[in-house]
């Protein structure tokens, strides 16, 4: 049996539908909004047009069946790892993962594929970053804490609206003495650079893109 499925060979939506107590399908195509709903794998009504729209795309919402699964609560860390892997294989596709239970958002946006991947090509926010709801950098704060245990306590006591928490390992690297290639190959340094959002180096560094104007 699989602990985590990496793919269902093209029949994923059918399997998800069969294992869900409810599934809603909304399709934007040919200027119209099409919708259909299923319960326990069976259609509630035929595919119907419910409105007009100029954009295209598909939205699938599903509720895992408690009759099939003993655990129906999603683990956001597992989802984040899987979507990060998918971002490597789908260059140019922007993937956004939102956990509305704790106002957490991950963004995976890889401009190039695996053939040109480097340590800093991954523009997705770090998986351990508990981001804040505030989008204005001037009002946003980033707290760097040592270790996951401290990170857990900090996340519980923070103000989610304006305070972000990023757990890091202690004494990660002396970047003043390290070579540049060793510095960017450090997972912790790369995580910090990605979280700050302003890049590194003469060509990529842009202080205007700094995501937090207060870093503690």
UniProtKB/Swiss-Prot annotation:
Its EC number is 5.6.2.2. It comes from the Bacteria. GO terms for biological process: DNA topological change. The gene is gyrB. InterPro entries: HATPase_C_sf, Topo_IIA, Topo_IIA-like_dom_sf, Topo_IIA_B, Topo_IIA_B_C, TopoIIA_CS, TOPRIM_dom. Its main location: cytoplasm. PANTHER family: DNA GYRASE SUBUNIT B, MITOCHONDRIAL, DNA GYRASE/TOPOISOMERASE SUBUNIT B. Residues 140-216 form the Toprim domain. Keywords: ATP-binding, Cytoplasm, DNA-binding, Isomerase, Nucleotide-binding, Topoisomerase. Few gyrases are as efficient as E.coli at forming negative supercoils. Not all organisms have 2 type II topoisomerases; in organisms with a single type II topoisomerase this enzyme also has to decatenate newly replicated chromosomes. One of its GO terms (cellular component) is cytoplasm. It catalyses: ATP-dependent breakage, passage and rejoining of double-stranded DNA. A type II topoisomerase that negatively supercoils closed circular double-stranded (ds) DNA in an ATP-dependent manner to modulate DNA topology and maintain chromosomes in an underwound state. Negative supercoiling favors strand separation, and DNA replication, transcription, recombination and repair, all of which involve strand separation. Also able to catalyze the interconversion of other topological isomers of dsDNA rings, including catenanes and knotted rings. Type II topoisomerases break and join 2 DNA strands simultaneously in an ATP-dependent manner. Heterotetramer, composed of two GyrA and two GyrB chains. In the heterotetramer, GyrA contains the active site tyrosine that forms a transient covalent intermediate with DNA, while GyrB binds cofactors and catalyzes ATP hydrolysis. Belongs to the type II topoisomerase GyrB family. It is found in: Cytoplasm. The record marks 171, 174 as: Interaction with DNA. Signal peptide: none annotated. This is DNA gyrase subunit B. It holds the Pfam family Toprim. The keyword Cytoplasm applies. The lineage of its organism: Bacteria, Pseudomonadati, Pseudomonadota, Gammaproteobacteria, Moraxellales. GO terms for molecular function: ATP binding; DNA binding; DNA topoisomerase type II (double strand cut, ATP-hydrolyzing) activity.
